[in-house]
Amino acid sequence: MKIWYILGILLASAFLSSAQENNSGKVIYEQVVKLEIKLEGDAAQYADMLPKERKTNKVLYFNPEESLYENGKSEAPDPMQMQHGGSNVMIRMEEPDNKVYTALNDTKQIEQREFMSRVFLIERKTENQWKLTGKQKMILDYPCQEAEMEKDSSRITAWFTPVIQSQAGPGSYNGLPGLILAIDTDNGKNTITAQSVDFSELPKDALQKPDKGKKVTQEEFDAIVAEKMKEMGVENGGKTGGTHMMIQIKR
């Protein structure tokens, strides 16, 4: 009996030590966004040339108190050039320099958003009302649990692992009892999936708060985007997952 008791203490100590070591690090994610772009007027004839999805790499730096989510290293795709109806068409996609900083203890977020060469800072409190479903699966050999919520008319599904004791997650998603390794919005319209987890010591400047840009509320930023998209003849803000898409036509 004494031997089993000692063994139990050693196993518990090992698990606690591992959990403590696994609360700080870096996660590389792949984001896949299904592109929904509606063009009006003369531009509508080029709709069938546009890509149907966009893949990018993202990185999350985290520790028990804070996290920073930003662009990872992705090769910029070459512009698509083609001819259509006697016109030369070039389509170029650019990834804006967006970042999301989260203070995990009070769920305060500072988001840096780049739009049409302008940079904005949006401060807010996160209100993620998660509900656990009881479903489980493995991601990168980590046991994960499923949680869901409704937010901004979208259904969000998250997979988090209690093995990594951080409430951080990609983008604005956080607040679960473990690191979020995957997000699915509206059955695959926007997915974010962890590709690797690294517990190496973070650089000292890895968790710097964004401080460049014009301070606006979320409502003000949404209005700016909607107005500009309306001027350009793009409906619904041109849902490209934050990617800037430019179409140049030469006749």
Which residues does each predicted region cover?
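Sec-dependent N-terminal signal peptides
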Residues: 4-13
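Sec/Tat signal peptide C-region and signal peptidase I cleavage site
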Residues: 15-19
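Extended soluble regions of mature proteins
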Residues: 20-251
